[in-house]
Amino acid sequence: MACACCCCTASLAQFGKCTPSERWTYTDAKTGNKITVLTDTLKNDRFLYQTDPMWTADGKYLLFRSSSRGDGTMVERTQPNGEKKKWKPTQIYFIEMATGKIIQATEGADLGNAFLANRSNKLFISRNENHQWKLYVMDLDRFFADVEHDKVGKPAKYERLIGIFPAEMGRPGGYAVDCMDDYAYITVEREGTEEEKERMMKNAFLPETNQPIKIKPTLCGIRKMNLQTGEVTKVIDTEFKVGHIQASRFTPGEIVFCNETGGDAHQRMWYCTADGKVFKPLYKETALDWVTHETFATKDYVYFNILGFLPRLRKQANGIYRINLRTDDVEQIGQVEMEKDRCAIDGQLVGRGFWHCNASRDNRWAAGDTFGGNVWMMNVATGERHWLVSDTKMRPDHAHPSFSPDGTKVLFQSGHFTNGKRLNLMMVDITNYK
């Protein structure tokens, strides 16, 4: 009844808007698995990147983002360089897993990134307001209670401003929250010195002649914001573009990030501690390795891919690997059967093998999506492979599989029903797999 009431107030405000469940199921024609579709095919929804938490701490709500569920209003802003930019803002939504109903949790044009707390039902939200990067925290328990009783107030009722990022400490980008929910680790671009810029360009990765340079090298770094006081301090500086920052969900003060080139790199994965005392490569690459899509999956392990999508890359070991953070030992988890995964997908690279990976928190399962548009799961102890899902199209975004915190479900996104034009958010139950 509460959901129906909330739907009636949708015309008054988007924040707190509640819509009925869009959940339905189908049977995968190739694998025979029953797939649960969580969102409507008419929308274009996306999960967060598979490295970031998507479940509230109590496991009752699942977060996603969408630019197609609001009122359709386009926003136009004048940029600092005088250019005008027009776009449809992305907002944050939650699926109540018990009922399937969908709740809008943000509104407005200034949303940056969102990150769920680890220890309580809170949501950290960055916004770019008046050319300032601000970090807020939202009380989700209070918000969901008001949604249930159709008494949602303005966003300010549920949010607290944590801090404003000092401009002199760099230009903020993505961030991750420590497992104790006491610090946010924030990537920045910075000016640096001429000597740093010279070293950066000298050491920059040069791809093969047929590969474009997608992301130019940039002096960057990591800063941390105290989530109680808003104080910002330096962690490290880098002489490469920092991307995919992740904080351990198990051990305080451990950070994994990458040298983001948009493709290959001399050294993709890096590790540091929040006090800046440790800053080192994670898995020292050979010249033939193409490492990508690392995931800080468990207490002691980071999972990653060594790609095999090109003929030259298949002349050596490739697939999903993991590295032990305590010993630096590296183990291969496995690879799909290459010939079975060969597939030409319009608008994508033609290749074979795993593209992204993840692992269950108990180290029992690893999952990966492939260039052929399939989602597989592997038993980490035995190497046994299970084909979960077929034909995700890998567009307009990749499948990006991830596990529910209790390890019973694999979540992914798929363009299967729209021929790659829009995404459905989906999940498959894995409790019957041994």
For the regions a protein language model found, what residue spans apply to each?
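Asp-box/WD-like beta-propeller blade repeats and closely related beta-sheet repeat scaffolds
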Residues: 107-220, 234-237
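Blade-loop segments of beta-propeller domains
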Residues: 44, 49-52, 69-128
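Conserved beta-propeller blade repeats
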Residues: 45-63, 108-127, 163-189, 237-258, ...
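Blade-level signature of beta-propeller repeat domains, shared across WD40, Kelch, NHL, RCC1
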Residues: 398-434
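Multi-bladed beta-propeller domains
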Residues: 26-46, 84-85, 93-110, 141-170, ...
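Short, conserved, GDST-rich strand-edge loop motifs in beta-rich repeat architectures
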Residues: 15-19, 66-87, 128, 136-140, ...
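Bacterial Sec-dependent N-terminal signal peptides
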Residues: 1-14
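Blade/loop signatures of beta-propeller domains
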Residues: 14-36, 214-220
